[in-house]
């Protein structure tokens, strides 16, 4: 957006804020309550999985089901949600001229949205070429002078469109909106930040939003005071955005809700009795400033955004509430009737769940009975079978270890609380994505006990042997031999998505956002590294197929996690 357009757009926003201030409310406490409910009740391993799915270049019905299921879980946990409601606008508060204007604007908005969802501009690919063909296509387009051409909001730099290939596209409706409570919860959990720090950082961003649209330059400056804002990413394609992405727009929306008395549009609450009054006030601003619905595909201007959200959401908070249960689009849920008197009521579904989980102090080390159980369990390993090993963390301070035998599917998988918290947090951001709080309940002493119990002179396969060797040597297991398969990174992880799709339920600890540096600068999100799933994908890479025997755990959950009642060790 050019500077002149941005200034004009913000002028519209400010004018709408002033005119609609009577419909705004202070919802900071409600947003924070919902964020706390999500922190305590949401499965963040599934959040991380959905974030991974949103990075795939093509997604199918199974991916959509995962997204919808997670959205429903979020909806069940929060109180701020919109309720399905059919709105029929009639002559009354709104004049017949008002209704004609609204009907025309809704029709234009419908055409714009649908056209934007199916771009036909040159250089945009919506088909099913392979990755190799797409790369060849990119080179050819550059050769003929199209490399720097059209880059709409739904294309990557190389012209690839990340597309949903689903049987029923209507199931995509209302599944991608951002929610402040969800943004806050994800920043806390996945950014491993204190809730108060996140609230303060977003509040400062919201204060900037009272005067201008914050941009990435503003964000960089704020990040110097609030490091957690560094988790926010540069602008993403609209087709790839979801409520679980750390976009600037999501953060700004969250910040707007934390400003008491800011008259932010994001805090408007719609009821059946005030909808027409809100629309009447919006039309007043439209006429005074000459606001309009643009024919140009792309982001909605403030008037378009307000109109769409008001007509879609029914009863609730059109900007910030969960709307995953809303069916249809704005033009489906709001109609204009100059003579009819149709009304439909919907009862709100009030649901709330608060599940708290916290680690409690327990005796350190394995008990005698646990040691005996471990030795018996280790007998399930075949000392002569092919065996993979992988670790996450540093060899002197590992946090996750996995041992896997593909012939019979047996695996050992456990975790360890780190001693170097600072290094752990760095590794979490750039490798494994584990939250330190999730490791407080793991069984201490298991690393040494398991390595000590491995069969003598055993041979282990690994992808990179240096760290594994250091770990084994530190436990005086120099008798164990290592085979470093030394695959290229891309080759080793070519079945990564298929393995995660099939076996993600085996490990729910990798909840954070993991980023790695690009060769040409900047950073990108990647799938977290899980020691167990890495072993599975390495085996799949070696045999050339993700079809592997069903993995079966050797260790019981009681061995991996402390489950007994707390007691004081004297």
UniProtKB/Swiss-Prot annotation:
The record marks 467 as: Important for exonuclease activity. It is found in: Virion; Host cytoplasm. Signal peptide: none annotated. GO terms for biological process: negative stranded viral RNA replication; RNA-templated viral transcription; symbiont-mediated suppression of host cytoplasmic pattern recognition receptor signaling pathway via inhibition of IKBKE activity. It is an enzyme of class 3 (hydrolase). Its EC number is 3.1.13.-. Gene3D superfamilies: Arenaviral nucleoprotein, C-terminal domain, Arenavirus nucleocapsid protein, head domain. InterPro entries: Nucleocapsid_arenaviridae, Nucleocapsid_C_arenaviridae, Nucleocapsid_C_sf, Nucleocapsid_N_arenaviridae. This is Nucleoprotein. It comes from Mopeia virus (MOPV).
């Amino acid at each position: 957006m050019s500077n002149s357009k941005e200034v004009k757009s913000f002028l519209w926003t400010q004018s709408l804020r002033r005119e609609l201030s009577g419909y705004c409310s202070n919802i900071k406490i409600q947003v924070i309550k919902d964020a706390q409910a999500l922190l305590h009740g949401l499965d963040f391993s599934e959040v991380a999985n959905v974030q991974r799915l949103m990075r795939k270049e093509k997604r199918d019905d199974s991916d959509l089901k995962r997204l919808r299921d997670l959205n429903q879980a979020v909806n069940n946990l929060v109180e701020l949600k919109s309720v399905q409601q059919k709105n029929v606008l009639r002559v009354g508060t709104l004049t017949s001229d008002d209704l004609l204007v609204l009907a025309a604007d809704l029709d234009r908005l419908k055409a714009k949205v649908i056209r934007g969802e199916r771009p036909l501009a040159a250089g945009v690919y919506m088909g099913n070429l392979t990755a190799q063909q797409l790369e060849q296509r990119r080179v050819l387009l550059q050769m003929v002078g199209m490399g720097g051409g059209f880059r709409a909001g739904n294309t990557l730099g190389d012209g690839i469109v990340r597309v949903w290939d689903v049987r029923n596209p209507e199931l995509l409706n209302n599944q991608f909106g951002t929610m402040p409570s969800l943004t806050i919860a994800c920043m806390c959990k996945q950014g491993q930040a204190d809730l108060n720090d996140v609230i303060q950082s977003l509040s400062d961003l919201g204060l900037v939003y009272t005067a201008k649209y914050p941009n990435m330059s503003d964000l960089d400056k704020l990040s110097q005071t609030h490091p957690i804002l560094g988790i926010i990413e540069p602008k993403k394609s609209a087709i790839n955005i979801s409520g679980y992405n750390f976009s600037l727009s999501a953060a700004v929306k969250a910040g707007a809700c934390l400003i008491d008395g800011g008259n932010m549009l994001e805090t408007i609450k719609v009821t059946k009795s005030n909808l027409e009054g809100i629309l009447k006030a919006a039309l007043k601003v439209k006429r005074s400033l000459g606001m309009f619905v643009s024919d140009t595909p792309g982001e909605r201007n403030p008037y378009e955004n307000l109109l769409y959200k008001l007509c879609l959401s029914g009863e609730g908070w059109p900007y910030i509430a969960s709307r995953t249960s809303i069916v249809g689009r704005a033009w489906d849920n709001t109609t204009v009737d100059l003579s009819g008197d149709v009304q439909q009521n919907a009862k709100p579904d009030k649901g709330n769940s608060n599940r708290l989980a916290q680690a409690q102090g327990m005796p350190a080390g394995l008990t005698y009975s646990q040691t005996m159980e471990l030795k018996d369990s280790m007998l399930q390993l075949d000392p002569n079978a092919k065996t993979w090993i992988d670790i996450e963390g540093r060899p002197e301070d590992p946090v996750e270890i996995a041992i896997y035998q593909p012939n019979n599917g047996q695996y050992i998988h456990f975790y360890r609380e780190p001693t170097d918290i600072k290094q752990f947090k760095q590794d979490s951001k750039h490798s494994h994505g584990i939250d330190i709080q999730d490791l407080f309940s793991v069984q201490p002493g298991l690393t040494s006990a398991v390595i000590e119990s491995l069969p003598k002179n055993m041979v282990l396969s690994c992808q990179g042997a240096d760290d594994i060797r250091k770990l084994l040597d530190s436990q005086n297991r120099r008798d164990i031999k290592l085979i470093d398969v030394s695959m290229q990174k891309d080759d080793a992880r070519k079945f990564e998505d298929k393995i995660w799709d099939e076996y993600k339920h085996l490990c729910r600890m990798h909840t954070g956002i993991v980023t790695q540096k690009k060769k040409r600068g900047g950073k990108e999100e990647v799938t977290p590294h899980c020691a167990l799933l890495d072993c599975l994908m390495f085996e799949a890479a070696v045999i050339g197929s993700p079809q592997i025997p069903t993995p079966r755990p050797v260790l019981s959950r009681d061995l991996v996690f402390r489950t007994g009642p707390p007691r004081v060790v004297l």
